[in-house]
């Protein structure tokens, strides 16, 4: 499809900013929170990450679509696209990857995902950095022909991400098992708050049988699996609404079951230990974010995707009903809390994504740390 064949599209922000471009993917209208990712690769993993539910993603990479779409890199069940919409500067007209099965645009049309191209993504990102993530909408085709004042009102009418309880919308409805690659050494119950498929895969490589359960599954219900450890995954929405999961994690900590959390799981553990959360101005979304481990002094380059964070400071220590706890990791860009743990080591979590997909593997040994924790707890 040539530029002349594409219909008009507009990106409308709730604060009144409007960016005109061209439609790609499905035609129509979509609403969500406008956020940006600085990742230069891995758009398929980004778009299928359930943590992006109800978000319109602005890509800072100047051209998107070069590697097409394959059947291997999706991070959700059925390769479902979770982003509400995609905003890009330039759509690649050629697909160049030996694994590609179809183009990005073909997949977006198949899954009815609305996109806009030909916009100044640098200007959009500067606006979001200056004024923060904001409610937005993409309108294309006939939908783009409505008066701009009406489109702005439509965008303003959508629910805020602050206070949004979204985990139940992306979580599995039934428990399922991911078997290890070889002999099962241990069993881990993983709470699916929006889990990425690469997480159970990392457990499998380490001899872990992973039982993935729906969000908010009562702690007493997971006893039937006789778990050697409990994991809480990444996911979308405001952690301040996750009171049920906070209570569940507190029960698990009281039972002294080894615990590991990623992203949303980090915020849940923090809240279970008495910390508070807040909505960030524009969040962290990219695959090159530096994080300092204050326990080792080492720096990891990490993959991140979060718009909420825990309140706290580097090396802060505090008392909890489960023993002393401390802040273990912070972001070198802005000092955001990136990890917390019980001092006894029985529970720990990080805000970033050691499973990557896409991104660097610096933090992948955190999965080994969990296996070692389980081993030590069995003795």
From Swiss-Prot:
Keywords: Amino-acid biosynthesis, Arginine biosynthesis, ATP-binding, Glutamine amidotransferase, Ligase, Nucleotide-binding, Pyrimidine biosynthesis. The active site is at residues 263, 353, 355. Its EC number is 6.3.5.5. InterPro entries: Anth_synth/Amidotransfase (IPR050472), CarbamoylP_synth_ssu (IPR006274), CarbamoylP_synth_ssu_N (IPR002474), CarbP_synth_ssu_N_sf (IPR036480), Class_I_gatase-like (IPR029062), CPSase_GATase1 (IPR035686), GATASE (IPR017926). Belongs to the CarA family. Composed of two chains; the small (or glutamine) chain promotes the hydrolysis of glutamine to ammonia, which is used by the large (or ammonia) chain to synthesize carbamoyl phosphate. Tetramer of heterodimers (alpha,beta)4. NCBIfam families: CPSaseIIsmall, PRK12838.1. This is Carbamoyl phosphate synthase small chain. The gene is carA.
